[in-house]
Structures are given as C-alpha cells and as structure tokens.
Amino acid sequence: MKIGIVGAMAQEVEILAGLMTDKTEHKIGSAVVFEGEVNGKSVVLLQSGIGKVAAAIGTTVLLQGFKPDVVINTGSAGGVAQGLKVGDIVISTETAYHDADVTAFGYAKGQLPACPATFKSDEKLTALAEKIAQKQGRRVKQGLICSGDSFIAGGERLAQIKADFPPVTAVEMEAAAIAHVCHAFGVPFVVVRAISDAGDGEAGMSFEEFLPIAAKQSCEMVLGMLAELE
C-alpha cells in the first residue's frame, strides 16, 4: 500500500519528512512532494501550501502523479466543539466548505453543484484514527470539519459558521478541498488534525504559539496509523 499524507505548511510535514528514508523531493507547480519510506511503509508526503486552491492543486498532483491508495490530511485546526483544548485530536467523519453558498439554486449551505453536501471520510480510516487516538491516550473528537479561505478568529464569522453548520467540530483552510479531490478520484481519505487554537479572538496568538505542539501531536497520530495500514 502507498499512503498519501497531506499537510499545508512546512511545520506540518517537516517531522514526517525528517523520518523518511530513500527520500526523493519533487517540486511540481506550487506543490512539494516527498517520496520514500517511513518506518518501512511506502509514503508520498505533500506540502500543499495554505488554502483551498493550493490544497486542491497539490492533492491532484499527488493523486495523478504518485497514485497513493489512501490519503491522510494532517496538521492543525481551530477547535469549535465545546470542550476542545489545544493538543486534542479531531478526526473527520465528513468535511464541508463553510464559505460556499449556492443556496439560491436549492443547494445546501456549503454544497457546490454536482457535489454532495459534505464529503464523507472513509469509515475504515476514521475507525483506525480513533483506535490510534485511544491507544495513544489522546483526547479525541470525531465530526464535521469545515474549511474556508479565512483564518477564523471568533466574532461574526465564527458565529455564522456555527449557525450554518451546527455539528461543526473544527475549522481550518484545506480539508474540504483535499476531500473534494479525493472524492473526484475515488481515493479514500480521512482528516486527522490537532487543535492549535479555539477559533476565537485569541486564535492568532494561540496558533503561533501552539502550532509546533499541534504539528507534533498530529504527526504522532499519523505514525500510529502508518504502523497498522497494510
């Protein structure tokens, strides 16, 4: 099995890249792809860049050029569900765009034409992520992860997302685009991210401070999953 791993920023992929052996680096457009082995498993690791378009470009490059069997999106997210704290793990059951609106034509909020209302994560990958989180003794929550091209720092924007998507667990800027591309190509995916901030008025300061912690936590989750993927 070849495992695709996607992170937006250097901080979100550098630990895994550092563990990779027989590593080859490819720069394709805005995407950086590291190809090699991690703990004996065949891995292609994408640093996509930030935002939905960069994530979609990179994921398309990954799927077309390197043909992974599954995709895991790793990195950080802003916690929205009550009780989530920095370092907690969120696992996607589904993803949606919080900034897409074609409701004038009868679509659900966040739904684009010719697409489902949400992109469902692979149930086996979701269950594996939950198993690893429990095995590692982590606080974890499964649910809807919403994506958009804005860093959410509380206020009206966060309130609107909660109103539009009551089950929302966490927010970030790439997952739904990655899921969209995986859906289009028929590749199973899951999002496994660690909370770096609470998506509130202190989010910017919290994100800068806690990103390294979130990156380490999500990386440890991915390594646990790699050990059991066959």
Swiss-Prot record:
Q: Name one GO cellular component term.
A: cytosol
Which pathway does this chain act in?
Amino-acid biosynthesis; L-methionine biosynthesis via salvage pathway; S-methyl-5-thio-alpha-D-ribose 1-phosphate from S-methyl-5'-thioadenosine (hydrolase route): step 1/2
The EC number on file is 3.2.2.9
Q: Which UniProt keywords apply?
A: Amino-acid biosynthesis, Hydrolase, Methionine biosynthesis
The record places the active site at: E12 (proton acceptor), D197 (proton donor)
Q: Name one GO molecular function term.
A: adenosylhomocysteine nucleosidase activity
The keyword Membrane appears for this protein: no
Name the protein family: Belongs to the PNP/UDP phosphorylase family. MtnN subfamily.
Protein name stated in the entry: 5'-methylthioadenosine/S-adenosylhomocysteine nucleosidase
Whose protein is this, by species?
Answer: Actinobacillus succinogenes (strain ATCC 55618 / DSM 22257 / CCUG 43843 / 130Z)
